[in-house]
Amino acid sequence: MTPCRRGEGRVADQIAPEGVYSKSGARLLDRTGERRLPVGFDGFETVAARLVFVDKSILVADVLESGQAVTLFCRPRRFGKTLAMTMLKAFFELPPDGVSRVSLFEGLEVWDACDGRYRVEQGVRPVVFFTFNEVKKADWALAYENITVAMSWF
């Protein structure tokens, strides 16, 4: 893919009726108008539909344009890794229930970037999602056992 300029297609500074607030290139979304923060939520579908969040969807474009076979996301605890991964899953995944996830991304930066060129990538790939969120144990032996059990599901 030929990269486009980051920020191309961004909404000008405004408050849009669909709950997209844009200022100086950053987007804050609150589609319900309830101003509820996503404390304790890390699933993108829930957060995007019901809570306030910062639009980091351009990560999709970054992944597509990187050309890398593998991308490692390293961040400290509580920095939104799982939210970012569930966003990527929701964007790329062939919906197992057959219900389109397009509405989650309409109005987000990735949807508008580069004249909508990333839209064709939405919902067209099989995705394997694995998280270590539930593998928190006091010692290595218990953690290893939980990892083995979680991976045996695949």
Q: Whereabouts are the PLM-identified features?
A:
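Walker A/P-loop-proximal flanking segment of P-loop NTPase domains
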Residues: 17-97, 101-112
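Residue-level detector of alpha-helical transmembrane segments in integral membrane proteins
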Residues: 9-10, 119
